[in-house]
From Swiss-Prot:
InterPro entries linked: SAM-dependent_MTases_sf, UbiG_MeTrfase
NCBIfam families: UbiG
GO biological process, one term: methylation
Biological source species: Pseudomonas putida (strain ATCC 47054 / DSM 6125 / CFBP 8728 / NCIMB 11950 / KT2440)
Binding site for S-adenosyl-L-methionine: 36, 55, 76, 120
Top-rank EC class of the record's enzyme: transferase
Record-given protein name: Ubiquinone biosynthesis O-methyltransferase
Matches recorded under Pfam families: Methyltransf_23
Amino acid sequence: MSNVDRAEIAKFEALAHRWWDRESEFKPLHEINPLRVNWIDERVSLAGKKVLDVGCGGGILSEAMALRGATVTGIDMGEAPLAVAQLHQLESGVQVEYRQITAEALAEEMPEQFDVVTCLEMLEHVPDPSSVIRACYRMVKPGGQVFFSTINRNPKAYLLAIVGAEYILKMLPRGTHDFKKFIRPSELGAWSRDAGLQVKDIIGLTYNPLTKHYKLNSDVDVNYMIQTLREE
């Protein structure tokens, strides 16, 4: 059984043509991208690394990591977002290899091939997040690192990520997120450890609606990212 939610894919297929419009529904992704790439780069030094971006969508993170000197492969199951990613790299001149394939299928094909694997804002959109985490473990080289980001599951996250972002501030289309699919840090940590990954660090991402700025800090109540290591 494929670990793909067709309804989730359809949501992003419908919006794909606006992926690189910085004033569109993807504005938050564009704004948080530099913060996240810096955090990752500080921990792994992307230059010269072979990197896999799981759930790459239209390529915002993939291109940013390639610009830091990484050799990047981006995978996604959305045909339209991948088409947008491929068109955008023709425009930007940034080289990324894009493929329409699941993490699980690529893990069969390319075990232990990547220095770094990123899987950001993707786990909350698949039926079985732990399956993706296991696939990421299989694809990263021993001694390599895997980064995940998702949204915590608690009343504050519901109020800010769904009610606030989708209904009040209208930063995202209604229905972008399903609260039941949000993932607590304890759950993500347990799935990572079960897969063989050691959790090294965790950071929160917060948004100030008054200043309209994001920042990384210790508050993991809503958005957060973890760094994990596959030991040698």
